[in-house]
Amino acid sequence: MILVQLAAEEAQNPLIPEVPELVIGLLAFAIVFFVLGKKLLPNINKVLEERRAAIEGGIEEAEAMKVEAQSVLEQYKAQLAEARHEAARLRQEAQEQGATLITEMRAEGQRQREEIIAAGHAQLEADRKAAAQALRQDVGTLATDLAGKLVGESLEDHARQSRVIDRFLDGLEEKAEATR
């Protein structure tokens, strides 16, 4: 009776389930837990493991990429330093070649200037000699004509005329040199 009374009291309490309901609920929970544990939980664990592996792989890959990027950066810096060194060397060579070229061009200009001056002096000397020769002939002709008029005889003989002119001009040159 006590059990009946307890059962009657229990029926009255809605918070305490009846034993058959409790057993059925526990069995259903165990079946659902077993099915979830055998079927769903391995899939969830598999997905979580794949995600963890992907994250770790991503981290490892990021670390490897960081190391590779650092290596590439060092190579870039080394190449940049080498390029700067090469540019400085080429600039120095260009300056040296430019200085050499300027020196050569100055020497060539000096040589050409000397040649032009020498040619000018030679031309002046040739012109002076030609002018002196022309003057000598003109003075000789005038002197012969004047001498012929003074002497009263013709100095038409060419050989005689040349001798007289030469003597006259030689005398003038001697006087000119004596006055200097």
UniProtKB/Swiss-Prot annotation:
Superkingdom assignment: Bacteria
A Pfam family annotated for this UniProt entry: ATP-synt_B
CDD domains to which the protein is assigned, alphabetical: ATP-synt_Fo_b (cd06503)
SUPFAM superfamilies in alphabetical order: F1F0 ATP synthase subunit B, membrane domain
Keyword flag Nucleotide-binding: no
Membrane topology: Single-pass membrane protein
InterPro entries with a match to the protein in the record: ATP_synth_B-like_membr_sf (IPR028987), ATP_synth_b/b'su_bac/chlpt (IPR002146), ATP_synth_F0_bsu_bac (IPR005864), ATP_synthase_B_chain (IPR050059)
Membrane spanning stretches: 15-35
Keywords, ordered alphabetically: ATP synthesis, Cell membrane, CF(0), Hydrogen ion transport, Ion transport, Membrane, Transmembrane, Transmembrane helix, Transport
Gene Ontology, cellular component aspect: plasma membrane; proton-transporting ATP synthase complex
An example molecular function term from Gene Ontology annotations: proton-transporting ATPase activity, rotational mechanism
PANTHER family on file: ATP SYNTHASE SUBUNIT B (PTHR33445:SF1), ATP SYNTHASE SUBUNIT B', CHLOROPLASTIC (PTHR33445)
Subunit structure as annotated in this protein's UniProt entry: F-type ATPases have 2 components, F(1) - the catalytic core - and F(0) - the membrane proton channel. F(1) has five subunits: alpha(3), beta(3), gamma(1), delta(1), epsilon(1). F(0) has three main subunits: a(1), b(2) and c(10-14). The alpha and beta chains form an alternating ring which encloses part of the gamma chain. F(1) is attached to F(0) by a central stalk formed by the gamma and epsilon chains, while a peripheral stalk is formed by the delta and b chains.
Name recorded for this polypeptide: ATP synthase subunit b
Originating organism: Streptomyces avermitilis (strain ATCC 31267 / DSM 46492 / JCM 5070 / NBRC 14893 / NCIMB 12804 / NRRL 8165 / MA-4680)
Gene name tied to this protein: atpF
